[in-house]
């Protein structure tokens, strides 16, 4: 985990994955996702896939939105709040805000499809 966190800090995107799956075509994607404050994850959705996040360290806000980009709900994943994970159902717009250096375990169905192909919500958040 320390090496993945170090790579995230050095990455221009301020995040780095360590994949447990062998191929982007695998049917189940399981990964560590090291994320740093300031990383930008667009509001996106996965039309046919649920996505699960489990916090291993740090603090992350997971937000969901409607089709107009209006906030619907949020959860702050961290050990202090005793909220360790969340499942985002398929086709739900969502994003993450990294509140402190964090490590997540992430799981979703494969194969990999870039956000640009699955859907990015182009709105300006208020």
Regions found by a protein language model. Name each.
Residues 32-47:
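Conserved short histidine dyad/triad with adjacent acidic residue
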Residues 32, 52, 95:
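Short, surface-exposed charged micro-motifs
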Residues 43-44, 62-64, 85-88, 94-99, ...:
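Short beta-strand His + acidic residue motifs that chelate non-heme Fe in jelly-roll/DSBH
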Residues 1-27, 73-79, 124-126:
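A short, N-terminal "cap"/entry segment at the start of jelly-roll beta-barrel domains
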Residues 39, 48-49, 92, 100:
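A generic "binding-loop/recognition-motif" signal
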Residues 48-68:
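Glycine- and acidic-residue-biased ligand/ion/polar-headgroup-sensing regions
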Residues 12, 70-76, 80, 93-126:
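Double-stranded beta-helix
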């Amino acid at each position: 985990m320390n090496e993945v966190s170090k790579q995230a800090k050095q990455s221009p995107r301020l995040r780095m994955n360590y994949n447990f799956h062998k191929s982007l075509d695998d049917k189940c994607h399981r990964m560590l996702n090291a994320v740093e404050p300031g990383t930008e994850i667009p509001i996106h959705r996965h039309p046919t896939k649920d996505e699960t996040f489990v916090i291993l360290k740090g603090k992350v806000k997971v937000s969901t939105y409607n089709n107009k980009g209006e906030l619907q709900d949020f959860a702050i994943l961290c050990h202090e709040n005793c909220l360790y994970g969340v499942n985002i159902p398929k086709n739900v717009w969502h994003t993450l805000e990294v509140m402190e250096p964090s490590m997540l375990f992430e799981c979703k169905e494969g194969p990999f499809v870039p956000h640009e192909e699955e859907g990015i919500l182009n709105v300006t958040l208020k």
